[in-house]
């Protein structure tokens, strides 16, 4: 229903317009206060790069963060990552991740980023506190913040926005009548726009999510997902249909698709009940972070990597490297 409202297919969005105007007034007022200096942002002693979006829902932001961190690491840059830690609840903040940190504490995306990149990762509702926690323990040259475009309390040097190239901005209205956190005109003031799928417009960086081999949660075995049989697909991400379409594009034959809420907590009995004997469960890598501790041998996940094309990604990386050095 939400997808139909935000796309404009359902006329119910009109009933939510008063709330959207209120949301837009408040969010616009907050940004204006920081631009005018009425409120002051905290500036870190190292460059800060924000990777965020203008819309609610999955846009492929986390794969971009992982790509960015890995690319900088390969070029000898020491990177730290901060996040709000949505879906997690720590005993105290800021929380600096360790190999023992669970997604229940830090949120699934920060744990995934930590496992994939090995970079220092810290979470806190106040992102400046997360930055300070990293700087107190690690000699990093640059900070990448996963989400937080609208978190103006943290000053930033570079802003990168990720857009779903198929859905883009839906009906164009602020939350809750539409998917927008800020107006589309906000793109004029950011440093880079990355478009996940669809057709990129002039000046935008095209991106695709490239799937890898499916990985068994228990054994670590890797196989092409098309070799797995009787697949039940599970996705607890911002836009589950994208994951299901990716599986089908890889040649997987899906018996059932189970969309879950983004950041939804997962328990063994609930996940086990999704499959019967002879079926194979395939989930996103983000869901695997939450299931690894109680997985069964017929549970697999499909990792995806961001693939950016054109000359703009190299120019963006060079800009970040020059800032970091």
UniProtKB/Swiss-Prot annotation:
Pfam families: LpxK (PF02606). Signal peptide: none annotated. GO terms for molecular function: ATP binding; tetraacyldisaccharide 4'-kinase activity. Pathway: Glycolipid biosynthesis; lipid IV(A) biosynthesis; lipid IV(A) from (3R)-3-hydroxytetradecanoyl-[acyl-carrier-protein] and UDP-N-acetyl-alpha-D-glucosamine: step 6/6. It comes from the Bacteria. One of its GO terms (biological process) is lipid A biosynthetic process. One of its GO terms (cellular component) is plasma membrane. It catalyses: a lipid A disaccharide + ATP = a lipid IVA + ADP + H(+). Belongs to the LpxK family. HAMAP family: LpxK (MF_00409). The keyword Transmembrane helix does not apply. The gene is lpxK. Transfers the gamma-phosphate of ATP to the 4'-position of a tetraacyldisaccharide 1-phosphate intermediate (termed DS-1-P) to form tetraacyldisaccharide 1,4'-bis-phosphate (lipid IVA). ATP binds at residues 55-62. Its EC number is 2.7.1.130. Keywords: ATP-binding, Kinase, Lipid A biosynthesis, Lipid biosynthesis, Lipid metabolism, Nucleotide-binding, Transferase. SUPFAM superfamilies: P-loop containing nucleoside triphosphate hydrolases. This is Tetraacyldisaccharide 4'-kinase. InterPro entries: LpxK, P-loop_NTPase.
């Amino acid at each position: 229903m939400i997808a139909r409202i935000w796309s404009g297919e359902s006329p119910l969005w009109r009933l939510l317009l008063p709330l959207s105007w209120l949301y837009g007034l408040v969010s616009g007022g907050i940004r204006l206060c920081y631009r005018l200096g009425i409120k002051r942002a905290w500036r870190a002693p190292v460059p800060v790069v924000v990777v965020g979006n203008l819309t609610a829902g999955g846009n492929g932001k986390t794969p971009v963060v992982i790509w960015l961190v890995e690319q900088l690491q390969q070029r000898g840059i020491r990177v730290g990552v901060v996040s709000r830690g949505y879906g997690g609840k720590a005993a105290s903040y800021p929380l600096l991740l360790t190999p023992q940190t669970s997604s229940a504490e830090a949120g699934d995306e920060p744990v995934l980023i930590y496992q994939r990149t090995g970079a220092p990762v810290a979470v806190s509702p106040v992102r400046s506190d997360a930055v300070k926690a990293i700087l107190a323990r690690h000699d990093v040259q640059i900070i990448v913040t996963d989400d937080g475009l609208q978190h103006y309390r943290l000053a930033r040097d570079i802003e990168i926005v990720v857009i779903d190239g198929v859905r883009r901005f839906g009906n164009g209205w602020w939350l809750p009548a539409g998917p927008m956190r800020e107006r589309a005109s906000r793109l004029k003031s950011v440093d880079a726009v990355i478009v996940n799928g669809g057709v990129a417009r002039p000046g935008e960086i095209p991106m695709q999510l490239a799937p890898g081999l499916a990985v068994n949660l228990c054994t670590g075995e890797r196989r092409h997902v098309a070799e797995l049989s009787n697949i039940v697909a599970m996705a607890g991400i911002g836009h589950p249909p994208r994951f299901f379409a990716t599986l089908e594009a890889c040649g997987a034959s899906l018996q059932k698709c189970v969309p879950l809420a983004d950041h939804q907590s997962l328990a063994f009995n609930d996940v086990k009940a999704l499959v019967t004997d002879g079926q194979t469960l395939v989930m996103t890598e983000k869901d695997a972070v939450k299931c690894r501790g109680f997985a069964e041998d017929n549970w697999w996940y499909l990792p995806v990597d961001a693939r950016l094309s054109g000359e703009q990604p190299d120019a963006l990386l060079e800009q970040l490297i020059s800032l970091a050095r």
